[in-house]
From Swiss-Prot:
Gene for this chain: znuC
Sections of the chain in a coiled coil: none
The keyword Cell inner membrane is annotated on this UniProt entry: yes
Protein name per the record: Zinc import ATP-binding protein ZnuC
BP-aspect Gene Ontology terms: response to zinc ion
Binding locations of ATP: G37, P38, N39, G40, A41, G42, K43, S44
Positions of region (Disordered): 236-261
Highest rank taxon of the organism: Bacteria
Catalytic activity: Zn(2+)(out) + ATP(in) + H2O(in) = Zn(2+)(in) + ADP(in) + phosphate(in) + H(+)(in)
General function of this protein: Part of the ABC transporter complex ZnuABC involved in zinc import. Responsible for energy coupling to the transport system.
GO cellular component: plasma membrane
Subunit annotation: The complex is composed of two ATP-binding proteins (ZnuC), two transmembrane proteins (ZnuB) and a solute-binding protein (ZnuA).
Residues annotated as domain ABC transporter: 5-220
Amino acid sequence: MSALISLKALSVTFDDKKVLDSISLDLHKGKITTLIGPNGAGKSTLVKIIIGLLKPTSGQVQRQAKLTIGYVPQKLKLNDTLPLNVIRFLNLSGKYSQQETMEALRLVGAEHLYKSNMHKLSGGETQRVLLARALLQRPDLLVLDEPAQGVDIQGQIDLYDLIESIRHRFDCAVFMVSHDLHLVMAKTDEVICLQHHVCCSGAPEDITQHPSYIALFGSAARDSLAIYHHQHDHHHHDLAGQPVSGDATQCNHHHHGHHHD
């Protein structure tokens, strides 16, 4: 299976300081990849390269033709003096019908927020609205930079469930960045540990035993790391939190939005 994005021996240097050193990775349709690492490890730089905002100093970035990317930023900066409700905010990123924007909000369980002031949303509510904005692109690749930041533990669990549902509904690749090691989705297909270079990569349960992971984060982090396992003894929920039955992978994937060539 060909990768949506393939990075080969990619390096980035700022002012003679190597921020990323010989990074190679592939992102595949329907797979969740989580990037972990301490602050200053180069995670945000790698995200900028993946979404096309930055070019590497050396190495190759190969993207599938007409690749569509949905991006959820780490922080949302809005002008506090400008009144902005959720619907108006969503329409800033493109011309969408009210039906399309309401459907995106419904998918993430935020339909009730459509008239809410963006400045007054909680951390979890803001993340859901940002996810809705990304989904309006009908992405092949969903990139989430620290999606659980500012969200409480239960909110994080709900958010990770939502991301898992999105992966199945749209059959998209998900690339998620985090420095919080205390809650990592067991649904992640691959964890990549970054400290300017790739220290180690693999399944979440394997990474915590890897010598490079322990050297970087310490044995205490290994012992305290909680891998959230999705419970299979209850009804699955749709993206708005309603119980459903059947296979989520059978949902339709509509094509619409902005493309990266």
